[in-house]
Amino acid sequence: MAADSEPESEVFEITDFTTASEWERFISKVEEVLNDWKLIGPSLGKPLEKGIFTSGTWEERSDEISFADFRFSVTHHYLVQESPDKERKDEELEDAIPQSMQDLLCMNNDFPPRAHCLVRWYGLREFVVIAPAAHSDAVLSESKCNLLLSSISIALGNTGCQVPLFVQIHHKWRRMYMGECQGPGVRTDFEMVHLRKVPSQYTHLSGLLDIFKSKIGCPLTPLPPVSIAIRLTYVLQDWQQYFWPQQPPDIDALVGGEVGGLEFGKLPFGACEDPISELHLATTWPHLTEGIIVDNDVYSDLDPVQAPHWSVRVRKADNPQCLLGDFVTEFLKICRRKESTDEILGRSTFEEEGREVADITHALSKLTEPAPVPIHKLSVSNMVHTAKKKIRKHRGEESPLNSDVLNTILLFLFPDAVSEKPLDGTTSIDNSIPAPEAGDYTLYNQFKSAPSDSLTYKLALCLCMINFYHGGLKGVAHLWQEFVLEMRFRWENNFLIPGLASGSPDLRCCLLHQKLQMLNCCIERKKARDEGKKTSLSDSTTSAYPGDAGKTGGQLGLDHLRDTEKEKGEVGKSWDSWSDSEEEFFECLSDTEDLKGNGQESGKKGGPKEMANLKPEGRLHQHGKLTLLHNGEPLYIPVTQEPAPMTEDLLEEQSEVLAKLGTSAEGAHLRARMQSACLLSDMESFKAANPGCFLEDFVRWYSPRDYIEEEVTDEKGNVVLKGELSARMKIPSNMWVEAWETAKPVPARRQRRLFDDTREAEKVLHYLAMQKPADLARHLLPCVIHAAVLKVKEEESLENIPSVKKIIKQIIAHSSKVLHFPNPEDKKLEEIILQITTVEAIIARARSLKAKFGTEKCEHEEEKEGLERFVSCLLEQPEVSVTGAGRGHAGRIIHKLFVNAQRAAAVALPEEELKKSGCPEERRQTLVSDFPPPAGRELILRATVPRPAPYSKALPQRMYSVLTKEDFRLAGAFSSDTSFF
């Protein structure tokens, strides 16, 4: 019984072979990726066109897999092509070898100038690469390499994928790949050798042919012919007789008068070093066979001059120093500084002298002014010394800018200062009529900068140049200090600021430009007021405010009236001017109180008989047709105050105040009153000019659409016109009615000023004085970028480079978006400057190449045009073919460049090296050689032979070799028949 029970007690161990190992899971993941990308089964594309590897579109897609805890990235690289016709495709797929094997023999795209390294080495249009995901990871051991190769071989066999699959091994900088491609009964193995030092027997064609033949091991005799493609690359680094001519501008020479002060308005341009560092000449023999050429360790038939194909590429200098880019970059750096002008210069910029006088004046101002201005006031009375005296005081020996430079800049900014007295109105330019040749004149609208002939624009250029060449930040602070003092001097002495458009501030420009325009408006108003006082005191007939009604009546007619009505339709430009101001505009006349009394008593009724007895004042001219409804007197257009000009910050401030009033009835009423200051002023002027008038009379002139006339028949049967106010004018508590009832008959010259030029000018001057250099740079940076873009466009027009035109359009579009924001980000500004520098470098490269190839020295127009096209292609394309190779016009020039460089190198050789070079004949040969030893030797060997057996299918074999000073690489693709071996 015991014996019988023993077998039953035994436990059998069962091995489950369905449990996948890490290796099997890895293979499964590779297959899964290939399936997802639909790389299963045969694929056949169109024959490769010449140059398609460079001109075509390459795309890639990636995924990530892992082998245990080691991560790999899988990337599919492929050339985008149209799929062939379905019928043709089905015919060709029968018994066809994989597409990649056919590509090994294609000669249309040997040595592509820009392509993936595997494309260059093997001529493939599609392939998959498995590489370690982390940059630092590497597959180093031979066993791991073999494991990965086994994995991809199994995955290709299981899926039927005919796309080559590569594995990257060793460190990534070595670019070492092993791979495989499988087809029906065929297989191609991709192998590679990478050495730092090349064995001497493999430096020439004969040695490489030996390797190729031994590798394919063809048993046939004679061996099928081997097709050979050879490329030798020569590098030219020494540009003899073509020194880079660009020199930084000499500011001292400019100030000394050699060039002239106007050079301060021009930005520099160009590279400080040659932006072309090397020229690479590739001499190619695309179709050779083994028997027609000799290249061994003793003799070579490979003469570059006799090569049938030449191509050239240029190597650009890395980040060449460019003047324009440096100028703008340095100016941008000021925006990041935090020091004030006083801190930089180490003294108070606007310190006052004569404290006793200042204190007395301040005391008087307290007595005469009802409310102080809520800013530190630099009033005219406090300016005991003129701005010019202050300039002399502040300009000491320690000043960052010497007097010659400063005077040259100030004369450039203020050309009217050449005469003893600045010109009057002629100093202000009219930007509304740009020069017809200035097609880019309106570019400032897009950049929110300033017109290119304006003072603000010139100031930006001068500050940019001073920052770069004269004192940096201190020089900028010094010039700004002098500029602000000049502004005050002009305000005090009624001298208009040159280089600014007349009229209200242009909100399309930068805020600083608007502030200067506002100051100019103040000077104009002050000047007109002062002249008006003089003429009224002398009883001149050319008074600015004529009181005699009959002198100008009916002169301008109905057209002028319509313009005036349109102008008067705008209501309430300044809330600030409505409030009780400490500044009074009216003159202290003896009958003012009587006038007020009459006005208050009669204002409520609108136009009573008592008002008709008042003397008319402030008439501009008689209206062409209209008469007063009440008494039939002619209607006179009054002299009115102009609305207050405003800058964008004042408009924003006004909007905030109006918004804070809320939506209540009281707030809305107060808002309406604040906005009706201009309307109230015009009503008072109208009442003063037309005693006995009614609201209807005012509306007929001021807003004709609100007075409705219709034809009616009177009692006698006559058709007459009868008019009445519009519906909106009849609304109870109408703002117009309220304003009319409160308006008094006061002419414009006696009214409180809508625009207090004294206060506004002081606010502007205070604003300018408080600007730090960083604030100033922020204001002016749009002008500097604007100037840089104009400079780039000007320089490009001389060269006519298509790619540069495209980049300039991108710069303008980008800048327009960025600069319209109040405080653009530094990163976005740096991007714009980088684009400008890129364009500058491209133009500098074009000029460098034109100088080297001597385009201006060509005697024949055809040769010149051909060279210019050649230079343009060198800038646009990675590699350019030389028409006629060494025998063409461009080829002869390139040959001459190499000859000159060789001769210069031979002269520079020391005697010891000449002695070492051997016999005199060898020395002579070395010196006479037109070209240096090739910097790179590339060979492609191809053959179609049966492998591994004589009866195997004839399949493509290929080996690529590259030899440089640094390394030696062999990349072989060897196909074999897996059915008949």
Swiss-Prot record:
Recorded hits in Pfam families, A to Z, give: Rab3-GAP_cat_C, Rab3-GTPase_cat
| GO process annotations (BP) | establishment of protein localization to endoplasmic reticulum membrane; excitatory postsynaptic potential; lipid droplet organization; positive regulation of autophagosome assembly; positive regulation of endoplasmic reticulum tubular network organization; positive regulation of gene expression; positive regulation of glutamate neurotransmitter secretion in response to membrane depolarization; positive regulation of GTPase activity
Positions of region (Disordered): 532-558, 591-614
Gene that specifies this protein: Rab3gap1
Q: Tell me where it resides.
A: Cytoplasm; Endoplasmic reticulum; Golgi apparatus, cis-Golgi network
Q: Which residues carry this modification: Phosphoserine?
A: S83, S379, S536, S579, S581, S590, S664
Expression across tissues: In the eye, it is highly expressed within the lens, particularly in the anterior lens epithelium and in a ring corresponding to the equatorial region where anterior cells are differentiating into lens fibers. Also highly expressed in the retina.
Instruction: Give GO terms: molecular function aspect only.
Output: GTPase activator activity; guanyl-nucleotide exchange factor activity; small GTPase binding
Keywords tagged on the record: Cytoplasm, Endoplasmic reticulum, Golgi apparatus, GTPase activation, Phosphoprotein
Q: Which GO terms describe its cellular component?
A: cis-Golgi network; cytoplasm; endoplasmic reticulum tubular network; postsynapse; protein-containing complex
Q: Tell me what organism the protein belongs to.
A: Mus musculus
UniProt record similarity statement? Belongs to the Rab3-GAP catalytic subunit family.
Major localization listed first in the record, in broad terms: cytoplasm
Q: How does it assemble?
A: The Rab3 GTPase-activating complex is a heterodimer composed of Rab3gap1 and Rab3gap2. The Rab3 GTPase-activating complex interacts with DMXL2. Interacts with LMAN1.
Purpose of the protein: Catalytic subunit of the Rab3 GTPase-activating (Rab3GAP) complex composed of RAB3GAP1 and RAB3GAP2, which has GTPase-activating protein (GAP) activity towards various Rab3 subfamily members (RAB3A, RAB3B, RAB3C and RAB3D), RAB5A and RAB43, and guanine nucleotide exchange factor (GEF) activity towards RAB18. As part of the Rab3GAP complex, acts as a GAP for Rab3 proteins by converting active RAB3-GTP to the inactive form RAB3-GDP. Rab3 proteins are involved in regulated exocytosis of neurotransmitters and hormones.
- Please state what the protein is called: Rab3 GTPase-activating protein catalytic subunit
Q: Which InterPro entries match?
A: Rab3GAP1, Rab3GAP1_C, Rab3GAP1_conserved
